[in-house]
């Protein structure tokens, strides 16, 4: 907004380094933007519980991931090809894209995701 007062300030609380595109779009739309990360994405302190869960994947009917960050961290630790017979549930299109980056996508895998964007 050249020469004018900005309408409002948007506070972006996404993890550090993950709000750049949104910040740019908001600034172009005339908003002041304050990036204020409230979540720090880091490796788990004790990988044993996740390793145990991965070792038991054959016992599960479904695995659900709650975010692209969860997918990236978990699958980096898993380090193997995801079993084709094990469906994966996710909450939004960003998570679907994260699964695809890790080679988990239809038709080889069943990915369960809502049709409407997550709130």
What are these regions (language model features)?
Residues 1-119:
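Conserved beta-alpha
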